């Protein structure tokens, strides 16, 4: 995987910028790495890791800030034949300890400001400050001789609905990302890709790092404070041509930053969105204000994105997009069976298990792994339907469906209506337990600045636009919706909400 992502570009254009690191959105980059420099650092880190005496395939847990060091160590471990485990710097000590123990990592790279006291005996600890010295060590490794199905990296799911579980990917995962190149990004070697997320997320590791490098393009990393208003300035300073973020950030940029159809976004060609359902009107508002298109994708840690719109796949209102060229996708019955449903019928979105981008499996979770496999298909839990032209309409997550008066209600349907209320800035819905035996639909609302917090107004608005059983019975006002470090909604937190 490391040879495919880095080695080819280093051989073809060694002096071309591979990575630009910005600490200030309005100043030149603080670090500029060529492909040759990236490869040299990665292979020297690989040699330093080999000197630690790790077993083949050993897990290497990364607990560092989102810097170039993180990216170099991730690929250095892969180049040596080890299995990096990227983690968020925002994890609590207990959360990080769980990942360390559950993964059985043999080496932990950790920054001084990210404490972790209960480290199991036998785990080697590398101070994060030492990694740059490893990148300059005298020894230089060669790429490990790995097979396509050998483990390459281990990602833990964000845990929005349950305890995190490890998703183990093979070296072929990098090859399995090829349908995204033109099926979502429309990427060329001339592009500069700016992703706003952290490296522990597959969206960032793939879209923001792996795929640009595999295409000989330039990746951009920002390490400064992430106020929504700074992104247009950084896009201009970095001369970014592709921008990737969660939908919420695009909405915040429109609200808090100065953007227009002129030069406010510099050379930007288009934006990419994934990670959560976009709020109603986002595509139209962004295009109207900036003159640029947004292209959406649907995916998951187990497969990454596999359904999308793109410069080559026109966006259809209400649909995520189409299965990327080369993907085998179907809609299967919710209650079992492997025969795909006809166009227009809602069911479980499934990807064929022959897809090279599909995970090897869940780390030490055979029972949970069995639940997502059905014959030749992998089922990730997304409800969807496919129209006669192959466009996929996402209908929510199967485990997010709310039950009200015997009916099944998708939270996204209610959210789409409530988001049109003039006092609503953001909204999320979930089934709330009000008594031991009674659950109702709850709406969690972040009000617009200066708006009155009037729950009855929200309820009346819903009653005029939704069937009675779909209307929220409780409205809870929040200063902010609960989100993961990468901006994804933590709907599980809302499900566990209890009224005072």
Q: What residue ranges belong to the model's regions?
A:
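Conserved AMP-binding A3 loop
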Residues: 31-36, 152-176
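Conserved AMP-binding/adenylation subdomain of ANL enzymes
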Residues: 175-192, 202-242, 256
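AMP-binding/adenylate-forming catalytic core of the ANL superfamily
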Residues: 91, 243, 355, 360-361, ...
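Gly/Ser/Thr-rich phosphate-binding loop
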Residues: 240-245, 254-316, 328, 338
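Conserved pre-ATP/AMP-binding loop-to-beta segment of ANL
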Residues: 14-17, 137-156, 162-163, 186-192
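Conserved AMP-binding/adenylate-forming core of the ANL superfamily
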Residues: 19-67, 71-75, 92-97
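Conserved ATP/PPi-binding loop(s) of AMP-dependent carboxylate-activating enzymes
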Residues: 326, 337-371, 409
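Conserved beta-loop-beta connector loops within the AMP-binding
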Residues: 330-352, 386-389, 451-455, 490
